[in-house]
From Swiss-Prot:
Similarity comment: family membership: Belongs to the XseB family.
Keywords: Cytoplasm, Exonuclease, Hydrolase, Nuclease
Protein name: Exodeoxyribonuclease 7 small subunit
Catalytic activity: Exonucleolytic cleavage in either 5'- to 3'- or 3'- to 5'-direction to yield nucleoside 5'-phosphates
Highest taxon above the source species: Bacteria
Enzyme Commission number(s) from the entry: 3.1.11.6
Gene this protein is translated from: xseB
GO MF annotation terms: exodeoxyribonuclease VII activity
Subcellular location, record wording: Cytoplasm
Function summary: Bidirectionally degrades single-stranded DNA into large acid-insoluble oligonucleotides, which are then degraded further into small acid-soluble oligonucleotides.
Subunit structure: Heterooligomer composed of large and small subunits.
Length: 74
């Protein structure tokens, strides 16, 4: 299911998972399930960002031969 989420949906769900984990009122098994889901969501978001970065670099390369530099947020 994670693979079907947009970046925004995955981040929103990840924030919910973090809030639930931070509440501290969870049985161990539920906490482990949420942790596992959070890791999967974080990996999904990273993969989506990596793809977006590659697309940006390709566009820069194609539109005028501009030197491609890795995207580095401020």
């Amino acid at each position: 299911m994670t693979q079907e989420l947009s970046f925004e949906e995955a981040i929103q769900r990840l924030e919910q998972v973090v809030r639930e984990l931070e509440s501290g009122d969870l049985p161990l098994e539920r906490g482990l399930e949420l942790f596992q889901e959070g890791v999967a969501l974080a990996r999904h978001c990273t993969a989506l960002l990596d793809r977006a970065e590659a697309r940006i670099e390709q566009l820069l390369e194609r539109d005028g031969g501009v030197e491609t530099l890795p995207f580095e947020p401020e």
